[in-house]
Amino acid sequence: MAKTPLFRGSCTAIITPFTKTGVDYEQLERNIEFQYENGTAAVVACGTTGENATLTDGEHSEVVRRVIHAAKGRMKVIAGVGGNNTERVLRRAEDAKFMGADGILMICPYYNKTTQ
């Protein structure tokens, strides 16, 4: 049985733009439109390039929400949720699912020594 890939085509790990006072949500939405107009099939919001480790929980949720809204179903959205705090990672993953993200990007906790 052949499987259909979840993601196909180019995928861009987008930046999270900032002004002097915080996240520049208008520029973020313009960036999503630019990606769509140039044939991008999927975007990663809040990955390492998107400042995942430095965003507050509120900023993270708002960035993911706005990217999903701006994509309007025309592109897949992958939400970066990785980090060292397991509870936060799980909460961000659930939030991304609830908001309609097509996938999540997780990493192994860094700086923590694993038992395996």
What are these regions (language model features)?
Residues 2-12, 16-116:
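Active-site beta->alpha loop and helix N-cap motifs at the rims of alpha/beta catalytic domains
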